[in-house]
Each structure stands twice: as structure tokens, then as C-alpha cells.
A protein has these predicted regions:
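Gly-rich Lys/Arg/Thr-decorated short loops/hinges at beta-loop-alpha junctions or inter-strand turns
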Residues: 40-52, 70-74, 100-101, 122-129, ...
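Active-site phosphate-binding strand-loop segment of PLP-dependent enzymes
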Residues: 137-190, 212
């Protein structure tokens, strides 16, 4: 009776079999392996282990995840992930700031919910978020050059953008680099397989939302935020980083590396307060 009532209620919905809407949350095919692994109690956790010697399997899985994110983005190093794509974008802004550079340029073609999170972070950290108009759906080079200033820290682009259009990231990041402004590219991981990598486009940090890789819609989130950067920015990355080493007998071992950046050691001076991950 309950199922019949629910089906009757659901019949009022309009179902689209082929739909290109979603605004960042899309219905993708999910391999059965995903559900099989996520049902394993010893594997399903949002926490990166503190005792590396007891958790080699979990650490290896995160290390392999980091490796694949680096391959996808073309970057040198990845962290163990953050809460979602919007958080990843906001954390990337914090990586670029310094006392003399606290202005962030963001085109209006970026997802409005990402912009909301960025503004929240910016207000807390004393950063100025400048939104650039995109009358034709993409950011134009002339608009960017006019907005660049001495206190600009970074430029954030989304690829493809909120309107589904492809930004001319290479040209825009090159223009920003002339003023020593860092480039951040927020990418769709599925589209990233077809487009030039974030590093090839001229970005120094790549972030994105991992939901298209095989996560249920889950009423809009939270999902998975991935982050990767060039090696020069490595010590500013938030969250955990798993590294590969060898033990005293020469066997391969996985460890949590560069922990001096993290909040359990540096407290309020840490690069971020994030210490959990969504990589699984």
C-alpha cells in the first residue's frame, strides 16, 4: 500500500530520459563495483588513518586515487580530497592569497553555488571577490585585462562553465600570468578527458566536483571535491597527502606525508582545518 501510494505521488513528476540539465549534479552510470566496495565496513570511512602502519590497504587506495587525479589534471601532486567541488575552489583561493594579494577574479559564468561558498570563505579571510560580467556566456580577454590589478591574487575559471560553454582558458590564464596572477581551473572530470589538462591550460591549481565519476545524485550532495597543484604549491595544499616510501626492510610502504601543514600539528597556523576526505 505504501509503495502504491508513493508510485502515485511519483507519477506527478515529469521524467526526462535525455536531459542535459543538472547544474553540477548529473545522473551517470555507476559501476556495480562502486556499491560493492562501499558496502565493506572496513573500507568505508571518511577518515584518513593516523596510524599508517595499520592501514596500508586504505592508504594505498587513497594514493592510487591521488595518482589518477594527477593524471586527469596534469598536475604534480594531489591531496586525499576535500568535502565537495565548491569547497575545493574556496580552498584553492586561500592557497593563492598573501598580505599584498587578496583580490580574486571570478567570471559570472561560474556556478552560483560555488560563488556562494567562495564569498563565505572570502569574507572570513578578508578577501575581495570581484565578479566579472560575461554578456556572451564566456569571459572575454578584454574584460579580464581591465580587471587585473596589483592586488589580484588569482583568477578562477570553470571548464565547461555553468552555461555549458568552453572558456578560452589558455588565453585567459596567459593574460593573468603577465600580472603574476595565479590561475585556478575548476573542471568537470568527464570533460577533462577530452579537453587540454588544467596544467596545459596554464592553471597552477586544478579543482573539481567528483560526482560525475560515479556517485549517486544524493539530493544534490555532498559529493567529492578533488584538488591538485603544481609542485611549487604543494606545501599550501589543504588536507591529507598520502606518499609512497619504503620500510626498513625495503618493502613498499604508504605514509601520510607533509603533515607539518595540518591542523593537528600547526593548529590555527595550518594551511586548512580539513582533515577528513571523500576519496572513497
Amino acid at each position: 500500500e505504501v509503495l502504491a501510494k508513493l508510485k502515485k505521488m511519483a507519477s506527478h513528476n515529469r521524467i526526462y530520459e535525455d536531459l542535459y540539465r543538472g547544474a553540477g549534479a548529473y545522473r551517470h552510470y555507476i559501476p556495480s563495483l562502486v556499491n560493492a566496495l562501499s558496502s565493506r565496513g572496513e573500507f568505508l570511512t571518511a577518515y584518513t588513518p593516523y596510524q599508517a602502519e595499520m592501514s596500508q590497504g586504505l592508504l594505498q587506495s587513497i594514493f592510487e586515487y591521488q595518482t589518477m587525479i594527477c593524471e586527469l589534471t596534469g598536475m604534480d601532486v594531489s591531496n586525499a580530497s576535500v568535502y565537495d567541488g565548491a569547497t575545493a575552489a574556496a580552498e584553492a583561493l586561500l592557497m593563492c592569497r598573501d598580505p599584498k594579494h587578496r583580490r580574486v577574479l571570478v567570471p559570472a559564468s561560474v556556478h552560483p553555488q560555488i560563488l556562494q561558498v567562495i564569498r563565505t570563505y572570502g569574507e572570513a579571510y578578508g578577501m575581495t571577490i570581484t565578479v566579472l560580467e560575461c554578456p556572451h556566456g564566456v569571459l572575454e580577454e578584454s574584460v579580464l585585462r581591465e580587471a587585473l590589478s596589483e592586488d589580484t591574487a588569482c583568477l578562477l575559471l570553470q571548464q565547461p562553465n555553468y552555461f555549458g560553454l568552453i572558456e578560452d582558458a589558455e588565453t585567459l590564464f596567459a593574460a593573468a600570468a603577465e600580472k603574476k596572477v595565479k590561475g585556478i581551473l575548476h573542471i568537470n572530470p568527464i570533460a577533462a578527458a577530452l579537453l587540454p589538462s588544467a596544467k596545459e591550460a596554464g592553471a597552477v591549481i586544478a579543482v573539481g566536483e567528483g560526482q560525475p565519476l560515479g556517485m549517486p545524485l544524493n539530493f544534490g550532495g555532498p559529493y567529492l571535491g578533488f584538488m591538485a597543484s603544481v609542485s611549487a604549491m604543494m606545501r599550501k595544499l589543504p588536507g591529507r597527502i598520502v606518499g609512497q616510501s619504503t620500510d626498513h626492510e625495503g618493502r613498499r610502504a604508504y605514509v601520510l606525508t607533509l603533515q607539518a601543514r595540518e591542523q593537528h600539528i600547526r593548529r590555527e597556523k595550518a594551511s586548512s582545518s580539513i582533515c577528513s576526505n571523500q576519496a572513497l
